[in-house]
């Protein structure tokens, strides 16, 4: 781990313009926006801010090379992704430094994201050559049936701020593998990592125009003209449920293929037969990874009443070991929230819970200074009516609710409009399968607190989204199925 990289030299290497048709260029309006370090409030970079004209120019560039790119061989595309995987690892400390500077997570966590994010490049470099079709006769014997997958076409990829590298690789890699061109819109709060990743893709040999990047302060100025353009054939979005719903409405006019990875309200269920020490260790990963700013973060700890006190005290002991501060400082294990609005929201959720009878076991205070810090917090005696139990927290707060039996645990866990991640700790294998059948979530971790993996299909149900990213399913989101019915020469006329 190298935290001694010269930050000024690194920031000077990161492109701050728009990537259109393989060229970095200024926004047509000349407008810019600033990127701040959430640990200090200092401006660390100023980027060109794309408008509607720039967005359309990026789509023009993507469309201009779509047919040629689709005709490249799977091996060519796989080799580019593999080279990108290698380059990301060669630049691991640079990527980690950028993430910590613009997003705030501790440097060691940023290093972990580099490893995780790069795996999507390696995984889809392998999947690119495994995009199999199917051949069989129809039951009547009159036709020979061939099904094959074709690139869906130009894509708009919109990524969030909380995992600046992994969310870009998780969308770009399958699009490249499938033979699609794309326009990438990174989050305005954390665009630097994506900008550097785009340059890395070019360095890996990606042809001009295949990947275009339009960072900007106005998301709607970029998304609206593209969604209205019939040439765009695919939208992939990771972000909040309200924004996702708005984008879905915009995608309806042109009947776009959509992938939506939206909000979550993950339950973390601890049954009476669970290994409590193991559950606490899993809870630290499920809750405090990324300081809780993750859609998969454990949002509600649903604990059997007979072990609630033991679990709470042991979890509190671990929370109190966390060191809050600037993620670039040695020994820091808990960084800042992304912005002042996020800090205010977390504080308001805790205040609402306390007003409704919850008890602060540890934490519950804002940090001092310029950064957006909040102490890791545990709340006990939390009711289901509190905002902290109903809303996505996106912060270092662990509300603990209790239950009496398995049916109540499932009722509490499913009492949400969301259905992304869930976690269960039990030593009973029969219960594991019963609970899996009863939970309404797309992802389930059993005796495991961190379950995301490039080889796994990631996605939710209900208001948590549509489609899957990663796994063998991930490349399918960027393809359309074509059926060929070929007359069987041995059949009758």
Label every PLM stretch briefly.
Residues 242-383, 446, 491-493:
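ALDH superfamily catalytic-core signature
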Residues 1-39:
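Hydrophobic face of amphipathic alpha-helices that form TPR/SEL1-like repeat modules
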Residues 133-278, 403:
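Rossmann-like NAD(P) dinucleotide-binding subdomain of oxidoreductase/dehydrogenase enzymes
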Residues 42-132, 142:
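Glycine-rich loop-to-alpha-helix module at the N-terminal edge of alpha/beta enzyme cores
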Residues 41, 77, 99, 121, ...:
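Residue-level signal for inorganic ion chemistry
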Residues 44-50, 65-71, 157, 268-271, ...:
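Short, well-ordered beta-strand elements within core beta-sheets of diverse protein domains
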Residues 42-45, 232, 269, 323, ...:
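Conserved C-terminal structural/oligomerization subdomain of aldehyde/semialdehyde dehydrogenase
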Residues 181-183, 360, 443:
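A short hydrophobic/small-residue beta-strand
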């Amino acid at each position: 781990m190298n935290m001694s990289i010269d930050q000024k030299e690194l920031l000077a290497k990161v492109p701050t313009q728009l990537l259109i048709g393989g060229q970095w260029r200024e926004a047509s309006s000349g407008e810019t926006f600033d990127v701040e370090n959430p640990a200090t409030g200092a401006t660390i970079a100023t980027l060109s801010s794309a408008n509607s004209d720039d967005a359309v120019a990026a789509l023009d560039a993507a469309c201009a090379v779509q047919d040629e790119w689709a005709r490249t061989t799977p091996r060519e595309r796989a080799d580019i992704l593999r080279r990108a995987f290698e380059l990301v690892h060669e630049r691991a400390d640079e990527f980690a430094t950028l993430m910590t500077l613009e997003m705030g997570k501790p440097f060691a966590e940023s290093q972990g994201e580099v490893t995780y994010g790069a795996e999507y490049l390696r995984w889809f470099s392998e999947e690119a050559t495994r995009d199999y079709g199917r051949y069989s006769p129809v039951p009547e014997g009159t036709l020979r049936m061939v099904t094959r997958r074709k690139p869906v076409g130009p894509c708009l990829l919109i990524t969030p701020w909380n995992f600046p590298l992994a969310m870009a690789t998780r969308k770009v890699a399958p699009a490249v593998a499938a033979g699609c061109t794309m326009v990438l819109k990174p989050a305005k709060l954390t665009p630097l990592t994506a900008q550097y990743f785009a340059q890395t893709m070019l360095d890996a040999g990606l042809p001009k125009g295949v990947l275009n990047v339009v960072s900007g302060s106005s998301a709607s100025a970029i998304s609206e003209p593209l969604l209205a353009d019939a040439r765009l054939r695919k939208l992939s979005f990771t972000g909040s449920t309200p924004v996702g719903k708005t984008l879905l409405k915009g995608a309806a006019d042109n009947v776009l293929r959509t992938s939506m990875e939206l909000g979550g309200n993950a339950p973390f269920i601890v049954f009476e037969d669970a290994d409590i020490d193991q559950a606490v260790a899993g809870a630290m990963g499920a809750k405090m990874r990324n300081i809780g700013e993750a859609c998969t973060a454990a949002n509600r700890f649903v604990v059997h009443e007979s072990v609630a006190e033991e679990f709470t005290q042991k979890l509190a002991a671990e929370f109190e070991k966390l060191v809050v501060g600037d993620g670039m400082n040695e020994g820091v294990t808990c960084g800042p929230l992304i912005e002042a609005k996020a800090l205010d929201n977390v504080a308001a959720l805790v205040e609402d819970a306390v007003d409704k009878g919850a008890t602060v076991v540890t934490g519950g205070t804002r940090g001092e200074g310029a950064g957006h810090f909040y102490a890791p917090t545990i709340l006990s005696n939390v009711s289901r009516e509190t905002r902290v139990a109903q809303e996505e927290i996106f912060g270092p707060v662990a509300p603990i609710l209790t239950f009496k039996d398995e049916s109540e645990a499932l009722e509490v866990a499913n009492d949400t409009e969301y259905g992304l991640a869930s976690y269960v700790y039990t030593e009973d294998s029969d219960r594991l399968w019963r609970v899996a059948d009863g939970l309404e979530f797309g992802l389930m971790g059993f005796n495991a607190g961190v379950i995301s993996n490039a080889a796994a299909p990631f996605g939710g149900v209900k208001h948590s989204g549509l489609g899957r990213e990663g796994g063998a399913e991930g490349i399918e989101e960027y393809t359309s199925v074509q059926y060929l019915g070929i007359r069987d020469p041995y059949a009758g006329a």
